[in-house]
Swiss-Prot record:
Protein name: Thiazole synthase
Classification via PANTHER family: THIAZOLE SYNTHASE
Localisation per UniProt entry: Cytoplasm
InterPro entries for this protein: Aldolase_TIM, Thiazole_synthase_ThiG, ThiG
Broadest EC class assigned to this enzyme: transferase
Length: 256
């Protein structure tokens, strides 16, 4: 069971809504993933009507919505988008995204921290997408963010946990949930994230662009379950030396 702010989730897999070939395929994949929290970019949704092609099927599916501020380049733009989302969707949950460079889509740490502090004060449950910077993640936690979402690699790159060493520090020092977001390309990446101590992962591109998004969503669901179970089982520690699994000389001594 995963708890973030006032919500609890059975699934440790969060999903996105971008890049799917159709809304129907998106919903089928989300259902197959078992995800209970789905993020959607406010710039892609018609907030004036709930029969929007993306919004309507998500509401019908009964998943919790996590609007994001993707496209915002400054704290001010993100705060504006957050208020639009809260008014239109009736949720104070927000995935805070601020990336000024459209080529790399890397989060702006200064603007993110500034916006997070303001939004928390305004009553939002803030989950910030951020770089894998242990100092920044701690600062975001200190200003009241409900979780932190450090990247594994650039958005949509499918490179996996390129920031693993920093993620381990973030996980070790965090007192709020850590959700690894961005760069997860195959189910084994998700397993690794949960094994190392992450509370959840957010996956979009790897599912949406797969030849079979529904089966890929199932694979990610199982991968997250495997990673969590492995961690809870208490894996053995790593060693630089070999350790025999059975006596090396006992049978020789017995036959002497």
């Amino acid at each position: 069971m995963l708890r973030i702010a006032d919500k609890t989730f059975d699934s440790h897999l969060f999903t996105g809504t971008g890049k799917f070939a159709s809304s129907q395929l998106m919903v089928e994949a989300i259902r197959a993933s078992g995800s209970q929290l789905v993020t959607l970019a406010m710039k892609r949704v018609d907030l004036r009507q709930h029969n929007d092609a993306i919004l309507e099927p998500l509401i019908a599916a009964g998943v919790a919505l996590l609007p994001n501020t993707s496209g915002a380049k400054t704290a001010e733009e993100a705060i504006f988008a957050a208020h639009l989302a809260r008014e239109a969707l009736g949720t104070n949950w927000l995935k805070l995204e601020i990336h000024p460079d459209a080529r790399w889509l890397l989060p702006d740490p200064i603007e993110t921290l500034k916006a997070a502090e303001t939004l928390v004060q305004q009553g939002f449950v803030v989950l910030p997408y951020c770089g894998a910077d242990p100092v920044l993640c701690k600062r975001l936690e200190e200003v009241g963010c409900a979780a932190v979402m450090p990247l594994g690699a650039p958005i949509g790159s499918n490179q996996g946990l390129e920031t693993r060493a920093m993620l381990e520090i973030i996980i070790q020092q965090a007192t709020v949930p850590v959700v690894v977001d961005a760069g997860i390309g195959v189910p084994s990446h998700a397993t690794q994230a949960l094994e190392m101590g992450a509370d959840a992962v957010l996956v979009n591109t790897a599912i949406a662009v797969a030849d079979d998004p529904v089966n890929m969503a199932k694979a990610f669901r199982l991968a997250v379950e495997v990673g969590l179970l492995a961690r809870q089982s208490g894996p053995g520690s790593r060693s630089y030396f070999a350790h025999a699994t059975s006596p090396l000389t006992g049978f020789l001594e017995a036959s002497a």
